[in-house]
Design a protein with these regions (language model features):
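Non-heme di-metal
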Residues: 1-157
Length: 157
């Protein structure tokens, strides 16, 4: 577990478990957005030494997207439209203006988003062991990857 100033709200897990299919759709869209974000960071000349690393992260996020998309199809769940995340929107609104600040803040924001995802995936993996073992295993497998993305973005910043 990562150490955060604020923990995940206590009502988060019951809400997720009550609408697991909706959460899977949302997660699928978020993986696509994460891939796009990693690719968008390549535009900054300050990150030229990290282009391959960012490209690798984007590829991994697209693999996660495909994994979730296939899971949705298997479960007969419609893909649906993406939903805005108030938490992610809140993180992104603190990105400062100015080239240097923007680069650093985008990397920190990406790190925070990946880190929180890692924490939530650990909770989901444990909570779904008995009722949804395949999904539990998927989330357990995603923990390492998301944790790696968290640290890569943090170190780039």
């Amino acid at each position: 577990m990562l150490l955060w100033r604020a923990s995940i709200p206590g009502d988060w897990l019951p809400k997720v478990l009550a609408d697991l299919n909706g959460v899977l759709v949302d997660h699928c869209h978020l993986e696509r957005k994460a891939a796009t974000s990693a690719l968008n960071l390549i535009k900054y000349p300050e990150l030229v030494d990290h282009v391959k690393e960012l490209n690798q992260i984007a590829q991994e996020e697209l693999e996660h997207f495909n994994l979730l998309f296939d899971l949705l199809k298997t479960r007969g769940v419609p893909f649906g439209l993406p939903q805005a995340s108030p938490w992610i929107g809140g993180v992104m609104k603190f990105i400062r203006k100015g080239r240097r600040e923007q680069v650093i803040d985008h990397l920190i924001a990406a790190s925070l988003i990946e880190g929180r995802s890692c924490e939530k995936f650990q909770i989901l993996a444990e909570a779904l062991k008995e009722t949804e073992p395949d999904i539990s295993k998927m989330y357990a497998n995603l923990v390492e990857s998301e944790g790696g993305h968290y640290s890569h973005f943090w170190l780039m910043a």
